[in-house]
Amino acid sequence: MSENKDVRGRIVVGVDGSDHSALALRWAVHQAERTGADVEAVACWQWPASAGGFLPYENFDMSGITRKTVDAAVASVVGDGEQTGVAVRTTVVEGYPAKVLLDAAQGAELLVVGSRGHHALSGLLLGSVGLHCATHAPCPVLIVREPVQHAPAR
């Protein structure tokens, strides 16, 4: 069995503009630096159920708004990529976040998600998207939590 050493791995990371997803993106980029993998930052959007089928106003560009969010998150972590040497590709898709991430993770080495996104209850240890991905992903999943803040020793 021959092995092609030129094939780079791919790390998929969910990005939604939350602090947890920023931590996940930082972790994915750091891991890619160590392994030589590429990073695919995936963001998605949905029309809110409360919209009732009506658009907020004509030419409302949810995809464009989401693209700006993911691009800003990537820029804050890797800038233009020169300082890290990691190629980060961004993907924006309409759909349910867990399904979008699972589809993107096909063929990936790793799926990285934050422990909670924008819509999770603050008391939960793991959001519904992270839980769904952890139990259904076609590859290993890493769920990134924010660092624990310990009280100073007395």
Residue ranges: model-predicted function:
Residues E40-V42, R89-V93, L142:
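General small-molecule cofactor/ligand-binding pocket signal
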Residues E58-T69:
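A short acidic, glycine-rich active-site loop
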Residues A43, S115-R116, R145-E146:
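Short secondary-structure boundary segments
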Residues S2-L55:
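Small/aliphatic-rich secondary-structure junction motif
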Residues L110-T135, H150-R154:
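Glycine-rich, Arg-bearing micro-motifs that act as flexible, cationic patches
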Residues M1-V7, H20, V78-L111, V148-R154:
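Structural beta-alpha unit
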